[in-house]
A protein has these predicted regions:
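Unchanged
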Residues: 1-13, 103-189
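Nudix hydrolase/Nudix homology domain
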Residues: 1-37, 93-97, 162-211
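Generic detector of short, locally flexible boundary/turn motifs and exposed helical patches
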Residues: 4-7, 21-25, 38-43, 48-52, ...
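Short linear motifs at secondary-structure transitions and domain/linker junctions
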Residues: 14-17, 31-33, 49-53, 59-61, ...
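Cys/His-rich short segments
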Residues: 26-78
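Residue-level preference for alpha-helix termini and adjacent loops
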Residues: 32, 38, 46, 64-65, ...
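A broadly tuned preference for mixed-charge, low-complexity surface segments
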Residues: 42-45, 93-101, 124-141, 199-204
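N-terminal strand-loop-strand
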Residues: 55-99, 104, 126-127, 131, ...
Length: 211
């Protein structure tokens, strides 16, 4: 007979094939949305599922609530053959690998302005030549991640935001570890910088795309 067990949602990060993991984590995002919007914020009436779209509707006053989706940027900052990578503080993020600078977009900000602000806040650096890469839904934090490349603009001395990061540094292409799980836009950005393209990464490492 089948055996089932309760697992943290982080287990989706290591699940294959990736389309099943995506379906599972998207379902948890929808569940989280519905659990947090049971009652209308305007009149207090019990909400109902919309019959026409992915939303909750109040049958009393007509208030409509949509799933929370917060835009955030993630940026691979380079200085020649070096890439800036960091590690999160344990209490702030369960991910223990090398990370790129990332953060949520604030009200009134463009994506580019968010990049400049987040980079200055977290590592005290300036960047230029910001270039869009691609986007990815990231249901773990109700986020739409927008990926970019950027180049260092000025001195490379890092001023660490210690309440967010435990460390940050510049790493030559040859020092960047190969990714073993290509399920995030951050992994793609690092491998595109290291190898020049995802295709080259797959060719050199023999990594099998498990989408």
């Amino acid at each position: 007979s089948d055996v089932y067990e309760l697992c943290p949602t982080a287990a989706y990060r290591k699940m294959h094939p990736m389309y099943q993991a995506f379906a599972g984590i998207t379902a948890t995002q929808i569940h989280r949305f519905k659990e947090s919007r049971k009652y209308c914020g305007c009149c207090g009436h019990l909400m109902e599922n919309s019959k026409t779209e992915r939303a909750l509707v109040c049958p009393e006053c007509g208030q409509t609530e949509y799933p929370k989706i917060s835009p955030a940027v993630i940026v691979a900052i380079s200085d020649g053959d070096r890439l800036l990578m960091s590690r999160y503080r344990v209490n702030n993020n369960p991910y223990r690998g090398y990370a790129l600078i990332a953060g949520f977009v604030e009200i009134g900000e463009s994506f580019e302005e968010t990049i400049h602000r987040e980079v200055m806040e977290e590592v005290g650096l300036k960047v230029k030549n910001i270039r869009y890469y691609k986007s990815q839904p990231w249901a773990f934090s109700d986020t739409e991640m927008i990926g970019f490349f950027a180049e260092l603009d000025g001195p490379d001395k890092i001023k660490l935001q210690e309440d967010e990061l435990s460390e940050a540094g510049w790493y030559h292409r040859d020092e960047i570890p190969d990714e073993t799980m290509m399920n995030s836009i951050g992994s793609e950005l690092k491998m595109v910088f290291k190898y020049g393209s995802l295709e080259k990464f797959y060719e050199v490492t023999g990594y099998k795309d498990q989408n």
